[in-house]
Amino acid sequence: MSHCTTFAEAGRLVDAGRRAPFLLTLCEEDENELHITICCAKAEPNAQTPSTGNAALDDTLAHCTPLSPDENAKIELIFENYLLYQVRNESYCVFDADEVRSGTYLCTFERSQLLDYLPRAIDVHLIPDGTDAPASRKHYGIYTQNQIIDIVAPSEPTRHLRISYA
């Protein structure tokens, strides 16, 4: 099954699983067209955790469930004309309380350091709609198990968002 939805609806779908998704692919297919495929995380309920030799750690791990990619629940996002994107190692990212975002794993930002930095990184006067107004661009964040992907684009990947369940 496959259907199109909005970035916010896809975010609610991922949020419902209460686990960060996994990044499967990130590539540029056509000129300035960014393709990102993520999949939901699934618990491995019968996984055995080996003993570490540390009783306190073993007790903690006994209450944990390993996660793995659920390739039956994929989300493909295609940004047709991005302005900037970056991939960060999630282990080294910091939370900025001054940023204004909505969403948990698929986020949109009203205010962010990346949006503030944008005029220093690109010529904002060349943005496709001909304006350098902040409303002409949006910051999207994709928070996966191991990466934080930030995309600034003039429009969201609405009609190119595909959710498939095998």
Question: What spans do the regions from the language model cover?
Answer:
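Surface-exposed, interaction-prone regions used to assemble/regulate multi-protein complexes
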Residues: 1-166
